[in-house]
């Protein structure tokens, strides 16, 4: 045990050394994405800004060392036959996607960092990323303990907004106990009473089920990707734990519930009983990346009970 711990610490020290070419970006709280192309060009995405070229070139060997050091720490191999690395960089909790030859002309990787920004909903309004009307709807939903879905595409700031909503819970309901489940450590909770679990994707169902024995007031899930997990979260939210939140990939406020329905198809041999969705979800908040501006809440939809004459979900959209 001691030997393995010593090996891990040595490998971590090696990784720290190898990360020096991008360490400034790793430690910059506004940086969300670090991209190194096969030619070594270092591109940076900062929250609220367009992706920009840093003007720097990272040498091929430095790129390869970052990939290999990360792989060694997370017990994965990268070779000419296993040319892809997917994982999380230890200590920094940044998601890494990397390729080496022969799939690419030269080693390349992309890092997605967990947000370090501590923004409030007031900050979003001040920066023009959230209208006062939308803020009022979100705040009322938090107060009324409605379940909230936060949707958008990749890199639209869903988790950053989720963190701001958690801060709103802490402000309005500081005694509420939060139970947080995610498969990558990205949620930055500032509530006084919470338990946060980081689990493998195949352990998410167990983690959500265990929530019921942990006396939570609200259950918060990082991102819904799988039907069984979504079903467990919906069931938990409908059995005495309202006021939860989670993120989901969708291209509009009115596309979130259909997306959730599509995930649930994994769990049902026949049609999904849609009432378990519209009875559980109260508000859908949709973010979009605005060119040269960054993420902005562009649509909020209140879910209405029942279905329309065509069997579709009903909303009041703002």
Language model: regions and residue ranges:
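Hydrophobic anchor at the beta1->P-loop junction of P-loop NTPases
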Residues: 150-152
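Conserved AAA+ ATPase "sensor/coupling" helix adjacent to the nucleotide-binding pocket
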Residues: 115, 260-264, 303-304
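N-terminal anchoring/assembly modules that precede and organize ATP-driven motor systems
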Residues: 1-53
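P-loop NTP-binding catalytic core
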Residues: 41, 45, 51-144
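Switch/coupling sub-region of P-loop NTPases
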Residues: 145-148, 160, 164-280, 286-290
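Residue-level signature of catalytic and energy-coupling elements of molecular machines
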Residues: 34, 98, 241, 281
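Conserved P-loop NTPase
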Residues: 278-318
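Conserved glycine(s) of the Walker
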Residues: 157
């Amino acid at each position: 045990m001691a030997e393995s711990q010593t090996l891990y610490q040595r490998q971590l020290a090696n990784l720290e050394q190898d990360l020096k070419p991008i360490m400034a970006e790793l430690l910059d709280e506004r940086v969300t994405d670090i991209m190194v192309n096969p030619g070594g060009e270092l591109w940076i995405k900062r929250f609220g800004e367009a992706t920009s070229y840093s003007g720097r070139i990272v040498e091929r060997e430095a790129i390869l060392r970052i990939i290999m050091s990360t792989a060694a720490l997370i017990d994965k191999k990268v070779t000419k036959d296993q040319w892809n690395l997917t994982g999380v960089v230890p200590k920094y909790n940044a998601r890494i996607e990397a390729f080496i030859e022969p799939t690419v002309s030269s080693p390349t990787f992309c890092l997605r960092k967990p947000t370090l920004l501590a923004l409030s909903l007031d900050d979003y309004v001040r920066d023009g990323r959230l209208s006062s009307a939308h803020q009022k709807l979100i705040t009322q939903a938090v107060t009324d303990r409605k379940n909230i879905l936060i949707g958008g595409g990749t890199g639209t700031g869903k988790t950053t907004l989720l963190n701001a909503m958690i801060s709103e819970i802490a402000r309005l309901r500081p005694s509420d106990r939060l139970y947080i489940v995610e498969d990558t450590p990205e949620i930055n909770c500032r509530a006084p009473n919470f338990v946060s679990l980081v689990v493998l994707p195949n352990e998410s169902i167990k983690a959500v089920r265990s929530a019921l024995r942990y006396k939570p007031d609200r259950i918060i899930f990082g991102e819904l990707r799988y039907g069984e997990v979504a079903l467990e979260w919906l069931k938990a939210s409908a059995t005495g734990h309202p006021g939860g939140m989670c993120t989901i990939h969708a291209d509009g406020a009115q596309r979130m519930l259909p997306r959730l329905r599509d995930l649930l198809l994994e769990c049902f041999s026949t049609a999904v009983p849609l009432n378990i969705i519209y009875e559980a979800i109260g508000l859908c908040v949709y973010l979009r990346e605005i060119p040269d501006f960054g993420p902005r809440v562009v649509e909020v939809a209140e879910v209405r009970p029942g279905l329309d004459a065509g069997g579709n979900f009903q909303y009041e959209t703002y």
